[in-house]
């Protein structure tokens, strides 16, 4: 059986940890190991880690944003890696779905929400995945909420290590840009068939609830920082499907 290492991200949603932990343990391809990168919020949120004896935790005294977990992922030992946002609860065949796509369709970067941009301001775009189910694998510009990939792609993430435009966003664009530039690989949303949610990358009810709560970056930060990051990578040569 293929092996998958999971990297969770903790900040202000301790209530989602148990759901995530139980979900990744119960996949048709169960997680071989589970890591957690915990950022330190301004107002300390209590996480109870006592019941998670096999969870490898890096608990920090600062908020390193969304980028550091991809450095932490270098500690994993599996062939495949899945990095999950803390608002994302994968369905039971999510890992299996991604592995099938990589091994039988196209190697590349996969995720549960795929985005195709219509402008560089990050205001007009098309989403695919749990928010807009796609029956077949869909090529996209970037993916978010989860990133599933062969560990060989992780090296490409760090080929360019310039200071990010923002520590709160841009890691998704950076990853897709780097694999496109250095590995000639693309980014995809695997199938999210309407009649089989076991393949989906996120529980849509929970994703909608967590993704718009008070701790959601997309809700609490103006889209201009996302647009600035997108323009940055486009200026460096990031090829977008509709632009």
Task: Tell me the role of every PLM-derived stretch.
Residues 3-7, 33, 174:
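Cell-envelope/extracellular polymer assembly enzymes that use nucleotide-activated donors
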Residues 81:
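Short aromatic/hydrophobic "clamp" motif used to bind/position activated sugar donors
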């Amino acid at each position: 059986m293929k092996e998958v290492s999971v990297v969770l991200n903790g900040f202000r949603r301790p209530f989602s940890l148990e759901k995530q932990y139980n979900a990744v343990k119960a996949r048709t391809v169960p997680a071989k190991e589970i890591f957690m990168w915990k950022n330190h919020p301004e107002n300390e949120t209590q996480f109870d880690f006592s019941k998670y004896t096999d969870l490898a935790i890096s608990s920090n005294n600062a908020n390193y944003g969304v980028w550091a977990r991809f450095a932490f992922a270098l500690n994993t030992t599996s062939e495949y890696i899945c990095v999950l946002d803390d608002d994302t609860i994968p369905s039971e065949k999510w890992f299996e779905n991604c592995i099938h796509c990589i091994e039988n369709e196209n190697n590349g970067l996969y995720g549960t929400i795929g985005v195709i941009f219509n402008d560089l301001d990050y205001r007009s775009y098309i989403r695919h995945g749990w928010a807009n189910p796609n029956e077949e694998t869909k090529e996209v510009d970037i993916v978010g909420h989860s990133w599933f990939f062969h560990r060989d792609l992780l090296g490409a993430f760090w080929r360019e290590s310039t200071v990010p435009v923002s520590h709160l966003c841009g890691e998704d664009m950076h990853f897709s840009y780097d694999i496109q530039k250095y590995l000639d690989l693309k980014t995809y949303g695997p199938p999210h068939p309407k009649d089989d949610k076991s393949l989906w990358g996120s529980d849509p009810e929970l994703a909608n609830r967590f993704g718009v709560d008070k701790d959601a970056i997309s809700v609490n930060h103006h889209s201009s920082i996302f647009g600035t990051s997108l323009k940055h990578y486009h200026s460096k040569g990031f090829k977008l499907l509709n632009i």
